[in-house]
């Protein structure tokens, strides 16, 4: 049975948070939404997420790039979003997936698929390194 992907959306703009939630729901993903870093930390402590979508501009002392480090450390794929083009250099240096607002929801889903594909490939590599073998072909 295939495992369903779970997404956490960290966005302080309620409208954008709801729009992203609707997009993930339409694509069949499970999702939760929170509006800031402390709420993200609580959600990550409470539940397991495959992907975290984080707006770079956040209230408080940690921006989205700092929040991404925490999410990544917990094994989540991360997508950063921003409407401020001044963040592009830092986003590129972070090595994380990112999208500049406004973006097409299809582009977001394409990045989600890339992350899930990479995670699946890493899982196969890990099993292979650990001595697991693929079943023999034929019969």
Regions found by a protein language model. Give the residues of each.
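Two-component/phosphorelay signaling modules centered on CheY-like receiver
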Residues: 14-32
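CheY-like receiver
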Residues: 118-139
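Hydrophobic/aromatic residues positioned on beta-strands within the core alpha/beta folds
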Residues: 79-82
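Conserved phosphotransfer microenvironments
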Residues: 55-72
């Amino acid at each position: 049975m295939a495992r369903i992907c779970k997404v956490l959306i960290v966005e302080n703009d309620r409208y954008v948070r709801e729009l992203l939630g609707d997009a993930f729901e339409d694509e069949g993903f499970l999702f939760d939404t929170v509006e800031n870093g402390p709420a993200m930390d609580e959600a990550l402590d409470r539940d397991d997420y495959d992907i975290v979508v984080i707006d770079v501009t956040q209230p408080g002392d940690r921006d989205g790039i700092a929040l991404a480090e925490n999410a990544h450390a917990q094994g989540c794929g991360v997508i950063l979003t921003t409407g401020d083009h001044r963040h592009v250099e830092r986003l590129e240096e972070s090595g994380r997936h990112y999208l500049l607002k406004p973006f097409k929801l299809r582009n977001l889903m394409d990045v989600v698929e890339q992350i899930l594909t990479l995670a699946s490939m890493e899982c196969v590599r890990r099993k292979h390194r650990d001595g697991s073998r693929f079943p023999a072909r034929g019969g």
